[in-house]
């Protein structure tokens, strides 16, 4: 029988332990008592072993919180153990991170990720974190009694113990294969659609060739004649538009002369306004704002300015008349320009339409020539494609059949399938062992669980009741009975003897003196095991092979062996 045995642990800078390491030989005696005051570090060994094996704290704290709060670095756990006649050395630390494993003195390859490396290690020693906390350790911190677990968690634990986890792996592989079959089926469907489409194209081509023969040629010829007529009509319209375009002769653009006369008229108008302003000043009298001389209506200069004003008015009238004449010419010029632009645009549009019509006529002509050509037979191509299609359909049928078979496997691998059958087979053994240990602890009731891990507790002459209705002491009896039952089952199923048991403050809880005596009886029967009792109660040291006392010196825990 294989053996899971912890030999030695050395740890430093973890919890209250500082840089001076604590070194414990774990397989030295059958029973070891570990005592100390609260906060003295008596449970730190358990944290160190758990971290060494699984890289996790035993209690429900973050990994970084177990580093010694004073030194804050160089947490290191070294663990020596045996499994299946192989000697393991595990070295694990934080700040810096360290994770090394040696088997029989040979260091294992760490090329995989730390998570994969850890999973492979747990498989190799036949122990998971959850199993360790249920069958190696019974404690008040970080330990959840089996009866306090959820139904899925209870099932998972028992499945691990019965080693039916392989079925879960098979289920994963099976589901992966189903997904792969679905993917292959989708690819085949796409291929099938492609082949069917190719066959369809060939058949359509044959039909198209048939349609292009006979009356179809005449229809195409009519289309060609209509397109040719349309092209000739467009050509005639283009020629007519070109002729009209050539007949439009543009004279010199009068816009510049029109604008120049406008500017001259504006200047003369400005002079007229200026003369009128000066005449008004002399008419109103007063003082000249420029030279300060006296202004009066009879000044001779008024007559001269009046003459100039008449000349400007005459010139302005002539320019206005000329400007009006030029405005007519400008409008005519612009109208001719627009007409030419419209004709040019119309010519371009009709040329494009004519080109498109000619292109259509060419295509129809090509279709006529194709219809008149020799008929092309695609029988060989269609035969090859049909053969390929038959092969695809056969492969798809095989996939559908395999999916059906894998569906059956899926049903078998469900909780109600093979796993359920295995669990059903072991339930009577579970109940037998549980009640065996309860009898040793002088319990006056019968405890049983069903295939769904629901408990049933009966006592002679009393009503049926539940785990939750018990006192803490009775719950402790049941928890301990379950612990030893799971250890027994794990050993029977795996063929692995678990040589280590750690009980953390179990005897300090609600268990009474009779319960403690019963537990001691069970522990004394484990002659091949190394049992560690962690307690802050008074115990008889003579009942133990060694006594490890943990105490604080300053801020750090030290160990005294007696």
UniProtKB/Swiss-Prot annotation:
Keywords: ATP-binding, DNA damage, DNA repair, Exonuclease, Hydrolase, Nuclease, Nucleotide-binding. This is Exonuclease subunit 2. CDD domains: ABC_ATPase. It comes from Escherichia phage RB69 (Bacteriophage RB69). Its EC number is 3.1.11.-. The lineage of its organism: Viruses, Duplodnaviria, Heunggongvirae, Uroviricota, Caudoviricetes. Signal peptide: none annotated. Exonuclease involved in phage DNA recombination, replication, and repair. ATP binds at residues 36-43. It comes from the Viruses. The gene is 46. To phage T5 protein D13 and to yeast RAD52. GO terms for biological process: double-strand break repair. Consists of two subunits: Gp47 and Gp46. One of its GO terms (molecular function) is ATP binding.
